[in-house]
């Protein structure tokens, strides 16, 4: 693959080479053109983060050495890059820590608001009360969050709100959600073509995420569609939203139940208003497209 990329670069003689994520670093050709790194995560930091559950010793050691290797590769390429594009200011700070001299800009993940209209609220009195988890289930941090939701949070939520259900939606090529089929209070949906009908019947998005990185597109999606977001600090760490204004934080099942009670008791309206406004202001596609265009043109100008 590396030889093919090198041959293509030699043939095209591009004005710049854009490396889209850390995972393509091993196949980058020797750079005769300016290098732009588009980093969706600082992957070394993601690998170094502890899991939601304690992993076996061999797996922890493997991840430790993988994290060091990836971080080293990221640092070297950041040092050689003409520009680094990160998806959050949090990742930009991490990139500057690895390569203090790099020119780095933030261009956030965005959504197509034309396809994500503001939905009418789900009535607080409607039955059942439904919390929604949306995310790619094949991504380990998401599956770990689903496990925690079903095994730890759902019993507490159902004790506080009898009849409550948790709906699980997201690409599940490996069929990992099958283990939750038949669990009381769990609606296993899996892969769908359109997420909007599932947001439409949800009272809140509930995200007990403990690991991973980058920007949580699922939160931006919920803001756009007008659903209150309940999440851990890690779930929302890279976003511009303010805790208490754009989303509500929980770290334990009891806290989650209390925050849901506040939302159902009238707190949803302000969260929805603020979340949609933030999505319109910062997280719509035209904002990102303009920023990406300007960033790349700043590197290729005069070439």
Task: Label each PLM-derived region with a short phrase.
Residues 37-72, 136:
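Acceptor-binding helix/loop patch of EC 2.4 sugar-transfer enzymes
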Residues 218-222, 228-232:
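Short hydrophobic beta-strand element within catalytic cores of glycosyltransferases
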Residues 269-297:
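A charged, aromatic-enriched C-terminal amphipathic alpha-helix characteristic of glycosyltransferases
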Residues 1-25, 58-80:
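Conserved nucleotide-sugar donor-binding subdomain of glycosyltransferases
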Residues 44, 63-118:
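Donor nucleotide-sugar binding/catalytic pocket of nucleotide-sugar-dependent glycosyltransferases
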Residues 245-254, 262-267:
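Conserved acidic donor-binding segment of nucleotide-sugar-dependent glycosyltransferases
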């Amino acid at each position: 693959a590396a030889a093919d990329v090198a041959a293509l670069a030699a043939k095209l003689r591009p004005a710049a080479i854009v490396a889209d994520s850390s995972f393509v670093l091993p196949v980058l050709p020797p750079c005769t053109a300016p290098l732009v790194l588009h980093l969706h995560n600082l992957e070394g930091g993601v690998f170094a983060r502890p899991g939601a559950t304690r992993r076996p010793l061999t797996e922890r050691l493997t991840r430790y050495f993988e994290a060091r290797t990836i971080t080293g590769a990221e640092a070297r390429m950041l040092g050689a890059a003409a520009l680094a594009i990160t998806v959050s200011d949090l990742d930009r700070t991490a990139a500057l820590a690895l390569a203090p001299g790099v020119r780095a800009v933030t261009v956030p993940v965005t959504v197509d608001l034309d396809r994500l209209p503001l939905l009418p609220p789900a009535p607080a009195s409607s039955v059942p009360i439904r919390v929604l988890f949306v995310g790619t289930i094949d991504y380990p941090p998401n599956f770990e969050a689903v496990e925690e939701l079903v095994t730890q949070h759902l019993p507490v939520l159902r004790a506080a709100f009898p009849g409550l259900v948790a709906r699980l939606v997201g690409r599940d090529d490996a069929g990992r959600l099958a283990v939750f089929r038949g669990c009381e209070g769990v609606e296993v949906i899996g892969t769908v073509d359109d997420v909007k009908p599932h947001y439409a019947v949800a009272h809140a998005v509930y995200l007990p995420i403990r690991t991973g990185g980058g920007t949580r597109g699922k939160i931006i999606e919920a803001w756009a569609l007008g659903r209150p977001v309940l999440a851990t600090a890690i779930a929302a760490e890279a976003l511009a939203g303010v805790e208490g204004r754009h989303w509500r934080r929980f770290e334990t099942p009891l806290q989650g139940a209390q925050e849901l009670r506040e939302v159902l008791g009238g707190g949803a309206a302000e969260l929805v208003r603020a979340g949609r406004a933030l999505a319109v202001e910062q997280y719509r596609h035209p904002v990102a497209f303009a920023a990406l265009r300007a960033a790349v043109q700043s590197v290729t100008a005069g070439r």
